[in-house]
Design a protein with these regions (language model features):
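Acceptor-substrate binding/catalytic loop of class I
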Residues: 18, 134-153
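A C-terminal cap/extension of S-adenosyl-L-methionine-dependent methyltransferases
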Residues: 33, 164-212
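Feature marks short, surface-exposed loop/turn motifs that line or immediately flank catalytic pockets
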Residues: 71, 84, 131-133, 169-171
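Acidic carboxylate diad motif detector
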Residues: 125-127
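A short glycine-rich, Lys/Arg-flanked "PGG" loop and its adjoining helix->strand segment in the class I
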Residues: 107-122
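Conserved N-terminal segment of class I S-adenosyl-L-methionine
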Residues: 1-89, 93, 197, 207-212
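A short SAM/SAH-binding and catalytic strip from SAM-dependent methyltransferases
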Residues: 92-104
């Protein structure tokens, strides 16, 4: 009989204390493949990690959005799900990685992002297909999406949206156990198995012609 993994997780914080969380290589690959769209005026939630990593030399400005008054790095205090909380037509790119599951009304947040993007602007979104309950925001951790579920959620987006899914059985198990990428054997296959997605992603463009 194959030995089952331990019931206790290896990490209680997604594997950050052990190395790179299991979902991060997929998030990095998704953003790296679409980094040409990270330019102009950009916005990201909580910090500017991905904006600066993948678009620093193409960005004119960075806005850090957070509802948390304790985040000194935030430059815009806003509830993404509150209509009108983001300025209209203010951004060329918005990056939302692993945020939507913490919002009371994900559809309202997407509407808000669409309104905040200029025509031709890009939303780069990732959401969990599975994962532990947030250790820091358990009361707000409401949602998980299959690729089909994210496709349905994005159906009202005003423009084209490409939905992709990434992960496999090994990385899904690693994520649940709190194992880091560094805990996995070096030969672990990071290819995608559509039966076992760890994250779902959307690259969505706001309809209309960019201003010249």
């Amino acid at each position: 009989m194959t030995a089952l993994p331990p019931l206790s997780p290896l990490s209680d914080c997604y594997g950050y204390d052990r190395g790179t969380p299991a979902d991060r290589p997929y998030i990095d690959a998704f953003l790296a493949a679409r980094q040409a769209g990270i330019h102009g005026d950009g916005a990201e939630v909580k910090d500017s990690t991905y904006l600066t990593s993948y678009g620093a030399h193409r960005l004119a400005s960075i806005t850090i959005i957070d509802i948390d008054p304790g985040n000194a790095a935030a430059t815009l205090r806003a509830d993404l799900a509150a209509p009108g909380s983001l300025p209209a037509a203010a951004f060329d790119v918005i990056i939302l990685t692993q945020v939507l599951q913490l919002l009371a009304d994900p559809a309202a947040a997407l509407d808000n992002c669409a309104r905040a993007l200029r025509p031709g602007g890009t939303l780069l979104l990732t959401v969990p297909c599975l994962g532990r309950i947030s250790p820091s925001a358990a009361g707000c951790d409401r949602w998980r999406w299959t690729p089909a579920g994210l496709t349905a959620l994005m159906a009202a987006w005003p423009g084209p949206a490409e939905i992709t899914a990434h992960g496999n059985a090994a990385t899904c198990v690693a994520a649940i156990l709190g194992a880091a990428r560094e805990d996995l054997p070096a030969e672990t296959d990071l290819s995608d198995d559509p039966r076992f997605p760890l994250i779902a992603c959307a690259a969505a463009t706001r309809a209309g012609q960019p201003a010249r």
